[in-house]
Amino acid sequence: MVSLLDIIGPVMVGPSSSHTAGACRLGLLARGLVGGTPDSARIELHGSFARTGEGHGTDKAIVAGLMGFRPDDDRIRTALEIAEREGLRYTFGKTTLDEEAHPNTVRISLERGDRAAVMIGSSLGAGRVLVTEIDGFPVEVSGNYHTVVLVAEDVPGSVARIATLLAEDRLNIATLRLTRKKKGGDAFMVIELDEYPDEHVRDHIRGLPWVRWAFRLDKVSA
């Protein structure tokens, strides 16, 4: 079924929902992977993003998202200047990803303190986005839910333990995906939730001995 949002698009600053609203939401999601506004960002644009991104404000929108601005925030127009004042170092480039990549795709490499992350995501239109890769792991993150992402050792019972912790806090899991590159290696878990867990639950998850790191990605859809 086609929704009204699909027809008219989201409330936003800028001329194009794909190049501004979606781009801003990709920046918001990437931001969560390092726990806040990054110290530095390398932003590589693919396809249509690379060809028309600057003219459509894609560059401003992504940087705005990295600073926590929403798609309807008027500060998007001056996001690059704000980033420079705030000390966010950013560079832009063009890249060619594989043939299956959506035309409006970006690879964002971030550093914040001792944390680094690389995310690939696409703007699908009408402000909708899809993250397809995080730190080399294939994922599917829509931004339509509150999301927990974590890297953990591939040990038996890890998924059940985390699901139990969330259930004890009366949280409903919308989707849970686990990806691993090899048996016994690191496993990447993406959990989309209807509500975000309280701080004590997040601390408990981070404190599990086989969890290497865990971060939150806030819901970015309208």
Which positions does each model-derived feature cover?
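Conserved phosphate/anionic-ligand binding catalytic regions in large, soluble enzymes, centered on
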Residues: 9-27
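Contiguous domain-boundary segments centered on the initiation and propagation of an alpha-helix
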Residues: 67-113, 123
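Catalytic-loop motifs flanking and including active-site residues across diverse enzymes
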Residues: 22-26, 58, 158
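Non-transmembrane, aqueous-exposed alpha-helical and coiled segments at domain scale
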Residues: 33-42
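Short, hydrophobic/aliphatic alpha-helical segments
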Residues: 1-11, 41-43
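A structural-propensity feature for long, helix-poor, extended segments
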Residues: 42, 46-85
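Histidine-anchored nucleotide/phosphate-binding helix
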Residues: 27-33
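A conserved regulatory-domain signal marking ACT and ACT-like small-molecule sensing domains
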Residues: 90-92, 119-222
